[in-house]
Amino acid sequence: MTKGKGRNPGASGLDKHLKRKTHLERSQPKSRQHLGQLEKHKDHVLRAKKRKVKVRRLQEIKRAAAQRNPDEFNIGMTKAVMDVANGRMRQRRVRLVESDRKKDMQTTIEHNRRNVQYLEFKAQADQQRATELLNEEAAAALTSTAPQNKHIVFVNSEEEFRSFNPLKHFDVTPEMMRQHPAVRGRIRVLEKTVMPEEILMSGGHQIKSAAQKRKERREVQEKMRRSGADATPETRAAFVERLRAKKELKQYQFTDLLEEVKRESEATASSSKGAPGDDGEQEEAAAQDEVTRLLEWRREQERQAAIATARHVREVGQRIQRSKSLSALAKSIRKQSQGIKRQMEQRRESRFKPGATRRAR
């Protein structure tokens, strides 16, 4: 019979299934909870062992210092360097083993690859932005200049050459012919195009018939006769230019500047209604004032356009220069990675060369 323990000597195999009292470790009292958790026995044992190791190590160091031979020599003393700041000997850099050195080289190559990709991306972005700015400036300069009249049209006979009409061939008006081909369009396209309300109200950009043009010419002649100007070609050209500027003024009546000009002109006209003999002079003075304001506004627009162009030119130069710098930096980093790869390849090949020097063991 198997001997057991306790009150049931024959049931020793069932002792582990008996219910026993659970012994709990004491917790930290509430008055000392601000100090943290209470140290348990296993924590105390671990701390005591560490303290004994430190005490033993300090005792060994003190004993070695007390028994040190002043004439003792060690080969490491020839390479030891003392740090003047703290009076301690500087630690020599630990030489890496071959596996660690290879891993560091591979890490450097991976970092260089990412840096090269980022630098090339930024350089390409700057180059594309500079190209876009140059294309915008070129397109604006192309469409704002007058045509060079280099369009050559070939005909089949002498009769077609004599009766050739460029307005009918290109389907444009004389005013459209003076514009650049990229922006002038065609009459049949403009007839089907819905213009914005402000352009329709201003009276500009509309195709006029021959009767309307004759009426305009008669109005110009009547105004010249009332103003008493000489009927010379130069005087007529200057007068027509002022009238055109006055008509163009109507296209910008939605701006504050020209609204002010309009109010001033209306005030001047209402104050001078009692002098019917001076209508021509007053109208001419008002037109001259409006033309002057319009020319000043045009000069201001040209100045703003010149400032924007200069800003674009400066930005293009800066972006091109930065793109070159980033490309040069990426090239140098790529060259460094190639050198590291070449060095790793040489190390790999030198292991199998019969005449290669080997490090003494």
UniProtKB/Swiss-Prot annotation:
Cytoplasm among keywords: no
Subunit architecture: Component of the ribosomal small subunit (SSU) processome.
GO cellular component term, pick one: nucleolus
Summary of the function given for this chain in its UniProt record: Involved in nucleolar processing of pre-18S ribosomal RNA.
Name of the protein described by the UniProt record: Probable U3 small nucleolar RNA-associated protein 11
Sorted UniProt keywords: Nucleus, rRNA processing
Bias type Basic residues, positions: 17-33
Residue ranges, compositional bias (Basic and acidic residues): 37-46, 217-228, 342-352
Superkingdom of this protein's organism: Eukaryota
Residue span of region Disordered: 1-52, 200-235, 262-295, 311-361
Organism ancestry: Eukaryota, Discoba, Euglenozoa, Kinetoplastea, Metakinetoplastina
Species of origin: Leishmania major
Any one GO BP annotation for this protein: rRNA processing
Biased composition (Acidic residues): 278-287
Location in the cell: Nucleus, Nucleolus
Family: Belongs to the UTP11 family.
